[in-house]
Amino acid sequence: MKIKKAVFPVAGMGTRFLPATKASPKEMLPVVDKPLIQYAVEEALAAGIKEMVFVTGRSKRSIEDHFDKAYELETELERRGKHEMLEYVRTLMPADMKCVFIRQAEALGLGHAVLCAQPVVGNEPFAVLLADDLLDGEPAVMRQMVDVYDYYKCSVLGVQQVPREDTRSYGIVASKPLKEDLEAVHAIVEKPKPEDAPSTLAVVGRYVLTPRIFHHLAHLGKGAGGEIQLTDGIAALMAEEQVLAYRYHGKRYDCGSKIGYLEATLAMARKHPEVGQQFEQLLLTEAARIQPREVLPTMLETTA
């Protein structure tokens, strides 16, 4: 069965970006001229997925508005003769793309958010994309993962190597190589301490899951952080189905952190067809003005 639906858990509070996220979802933070959620949706579209399922919380209405028709804006752009921008706005949501919005009544974790999508997803395999992770790949990372699913017909986790000291921030897999860039997962642990981590292969915000995951999520108790963890559901799923870890081809920007968000903005601005060249010149100009901070030699001595 083909992957036709993508789930976007967008109910998080975004506290690391306060006050910017006090009244606006973190998924609507712009990277140059597109919000994070649009990058994720475009990645799903590039994978041939047409039905987008957004699991939302309070103060998330702007996501729904973003993917809705904007008649007043279109009329104004047409009046001003801005036909190129008008066409761009009109194609923001392709005619064959469907959006469904589901409210997550309680913030009970990523696993619970995915479980909330079951009434819409039904008994089909599906993708999960976390907009916090902006993945820049060619072809699109979700396209790569769907291709893996189409061949093996089992759940696929997007993974990358991380420093051991960072394992406490990720779900970490233990696995055995199958072929280049693909591994068979035999264990997965949510946010282990560095000394307890089975490896440094971390799951990032991309998943292709079989519908059997819903059964396991529905029977889970609360795990790490007092939440229903998707990682725990995947661990239970492995007892009856194969789960693969795929080392995707592309660059990940962790836009859940301020530095990662700034890095993504810098990278996307440099690639932008309208402002890229000017932005690179601006970077060179600003770099020439930067003076070494007094604390830098001390930091270098400490790490030497």
Predicted regions and their residues:
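N-terminal glycine-rich phosphate-binding loop and ensuing alpha1 helix
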Residues: 2-79, 140-144
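Conserved beta-strand scaffold positions in the cores of enzyme catalytic domains, especially
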Residues: 28, 99-101, 155, 243-245, ...
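Residues at the starts of beta-strands that form the adenosine-phosphate
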Residues: 5, 50-52, 98, 125, ...
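Catalytic, metal-anchored helix/loop core of enzyme active sites in primary metabolism
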Residues: 270, 276-295, 299-302
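Catalytic-core segments of class I nucleotidyltransferases/pyrophosphorylases
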Residues: 127, 146-150, 177-281
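Structural beta-sheet core signal
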Residues: 8, 54, 128, 157-158, ...
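Conserved beta-loop-beta/alpha segment of the NTase-like Rossmann-fold superfamily
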Residues: 73-76, 89-175, 209-211, 217-220
